[in-house]
Amino acid sequence: MIVLGLEGTAHTISAGIVDEKSILSNVSSTYVPEHGGIHPREAAVHHADKIYDVIKRSFDNAGLKPEDLDLIAFSMGPGLGPCLRVVSTAARALSIKYSKPLLGVNHPLGHVEIGRKLSGARDPIMLYISGGNTQVIAHLNGRYRVLGETMDIGLGNMLDKFARDLGIPFPGGPVIERMALDGKDLLELPYSVKGMDTSFSGIYTAAKRYLSLGKNKNDICYSLQETSFSMVVEVLERAMYYTNKNEILLAGGVARNDRLRSMVNDMARDSGYKAYLTDKEYCMDNGAMIAQAGMLMYMHGARQDIMETRINQRFRIDEVPAPWIKDENSISFKDKGAESIITNGEFYGRSVVFKKRPEKSYRDKRLDLKIRLERMKNEFYIMYYLHKTGNAPIVYDFDRFDMVLTIERINGLTMNDYFKSKYDENVIRMIADAVAKMHGLRISHGDLTPNNIIISDKIYFIDTSMGHLRCSDEDIADDLFLLYESMKSLYVNGHEMIKHFENEYSKNVEDYNYYKELIKKIESRRRYV
């Protein structure tokens, strides 16, 4: 099967041709603004001017003609409206002229599938970082799911904005990477991770302030990279634990950054995962990735009438079925958490687990020590207060020098393991009661996923290191949002589970509708919703 793919979501117009085995050609032209960032209409003018030449060269390089095609695929979204309209119009014109079937493709799906094609990865979790996107994506229950993402600006956008403050034209990320190599001092920047989601606007504001104070520019660039990259690699590692998968795929324009690539490699090596780093040429937006995704969709039954190919600027990857992937959950985490190593033992005759937070080699040592100590102290205090509800194990000892917590051992199954084999409405109600009790004390968990809930004779919460005492209403809504998203992603009957949870939780919490509105606001901050 021979497929032409046309990409044009942002700054790059590209045409690529693939078959089942290889990439036959890939030709691109990138719009570079004279000043500032990308101007959508100017980029669209560039695309309209270059698209004929890009398509012609792609056919010439492949030694093919339009008549040889079996399918035309184009990037339907997400992206900049004027740019998307140029590429979709060209794709429709080719489809009509040569009587070829047409498919609109989700742009992030293209990044996943070209990465899999080039690397041989089977069922990876993808860390996708570009100018507009920062997402952790995994295939679960028939389609790709967004497990975590930025709640404001993309990481690449943040780097480009700061580069403009330095007087560096677009694209500024590569220059920041070079400047960071000469940085030494780690400046304190907000480390903004909430559960599986991240935020970069606060980091940008703080970096801009350091610039106004006259701090060394190389040090600011170094700190900007170390902090923001550590955040996304941490969320990626948590996603690996959360899904039990063992393959990592790195993609997107920012994935060309050598420091980010080394951090992902270090994390994978230390944790026993396989890391696949997309070839730098194909990290950038390209037509071949759209062709590859379109081919897989078509081979698995996807068809679109031309009237169904309207662009969608807010097109999310989790809207697209992906039946060609077989989920492979092959890693057991009985002796480790996302950030810890667990060993069983005794403490003065009591059965306990020793939870150690080891160094993370991918992080700057100064940042790593700060995060580990803060998280461990926070976990100790929250577990202490939460134990009063009966829904947390006892913490017997806190060794801040060796970074070890000694915790009562609970015999039971995580919620994730429990619901793999059966569905129990009563257990959902027990979980809802326990969560309501925790929130009633104004305690938030901070990472309320099925791997951090143990089902035994009652419900226990573990790993509260990202939670809050005297928490805000939004902290509570964040807990619920993360738990609901986990249920929808991990379980076929996730929506039914949420319904039963809500019914029970609302009995124990005043004005649950208020929290539902907060959850909607949190969801609205995600990209393309």
Swiss-Prot record:
Subcellular location as annotated: Cytoplasm
Binding site for L-threonylcarbamoyladenylate: Y128, I129, S130, G131, G132, D160, G173, E177, N257
Pfam family, one: TsaD
Residue span of region Kae1: 1-324
Keyword field contains ATP-binding: yes
Enzyme class name: transferase
GO BP terms in the entry: tRNA threonylcarbamoyladenosine modification
Database matches in PANTHER family: TRNA N6-ADENOSINE THREONYLCARBAMOYLTRANSFERASE
Protein's UniProt name: Probable bifunctional tRNA threonylcarbamoyladenosine biosynthesis protein
Organism: Picrophilus torridus (strain ATCC 700027 / DSM 9790 / JCM 10055 / NBRC 100828 / KAW 2/3)
Taxonomic lineage from the root: Archaea, Methanobacteriati, Thermoplasmatota, Thermoplasmata, Thermoplasmatales
